[in-house]
Regions:
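A short, structured surface patch at a secondary-structure boundary
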Residues: 1-38, 49
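Solvent-exposed loop/turn segments at secondary-structure junctions
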Residues: 9-11, 30, 43, 50-52, ...
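Alpha-helical, coiled-coil/dimerization segments enriched in small aliphatic residues
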Residues: 10-13, 131-161
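Short helix-initiation/N-cap motifs at beta->coil->alpha
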Residues: 25-32, 155-164
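Proline-aspartate-enriched helix->loop->beta-strand connector
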Residues: 38-46, 62, 168, 172-177
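Extracytoplasmic substrate-binding proteins
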Residues: 53-56, 60-126, 211, 220-226
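Structured C-terminal subdomain patch of bacterial secreted/periplasmic proteins
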Residues: 76, 174-226
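Ligand-binding pocket segment of bilobal, Venus flytrap-like solute-binding proteins
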Residues: 140, 158-185
């Protein structure tokens, strides 16, 4: 068993050197059904992004949906890894991967146990900002890694809570994690870069303490399912 096709246009940087090993079979949100059919796969693995196409894809091959549960993020990622181990007859490697990741998580938790600063995660997208906290797609930062969320109630929707400059200052995180969605999808955005160059941002504790941290956007946005 081997992977023969994927959405190569949206490969995260750490997998980019492998892109030419696979046929391009569409995007993260829309499959190229003809290209998939030509590959004659024995199995098609999709995420929630492609659920609307599941019935159509099942005409080509059986479909397995690997998704994540934001209320039990790490638990669902472990389940996905185990499932992939079974599919590709690599159960032992899957178990080893889970053990390694658990060790990394425990290492981070040992450090965050001594951090009391309040944390917010901010997603930048074509010049707009969305805030995320516990119970969200980035809730792993708080619920598994142990960072302390801000006191403000943040809507835990898939796309986060829209926030402006005044709102960000009112929340006033002491640590701000930033994920650039536009960059994750392969496009540089001057609008996004300019979002954090603002007097309101400069007044936040996160800025004053030099704790605005840019996360690897493609890793956090594209690879969230493990």
């Amino acid at each position: 068993d081997a992977v023969t096709g994927t959405a190569t246009d949206n490969m995260p940087a750490y997998l980019a050197d492998k892109a030419d090993q696979f046929e391009n079979v569409g995007t993260l949100k829309e499959p190229n059904v003809e290209a998939l059919a030509n590959l004659a796969p024995e199995l098609i693995i999709i995420s929630n992004r492609l659920l609307d196409f599941a019935e159509q894809l099942e005409e080509i091959a059986p479909v397995v949906v690997l998704s994540v549960d934001y209320t039990d993020y790490w638990g669902s990622v472990q389940k996905n890894i185990t499932t992939l181990g079974v599919i590709f007859d690599e159960e032992e490697a899957a178990e080893e991967a889970i053990v390694t990741l658990n060790e990394e998580i425990e290492s981070v938790k040992a450090k965050t146990a001594g951090i009391s600063e309040k944390t917010l995660t901010l997603l930048l997208n074509d010049g707009s900002m969305s805030a995320f906290s516990t119970g969200s797609r980035f809730g792993f930062i708080y619920e598994t890694l142990g960072f302390t969320p801000v006191d403000a109630a943040i809507e835990d929707s898939t796309h986060g809570q829209s926030v402006g400059y005044e709102g960000l200052l009112e929340i006033n995180p002491q640590i701000l994690f930033v994920i650039d969605r536009t960059a994750a999808l392969g496009t540089a955005s001057d609008e996004n870069a300019a979002l954090l160059e603002n007097d309101f941002v400069y007044q936040t504790d996160a800025y004053k303490n030099n704790k605005i941290i840019n996360l690897s956007s493609d890793l956090w946005y594209l690879s969230g399912g493990g």
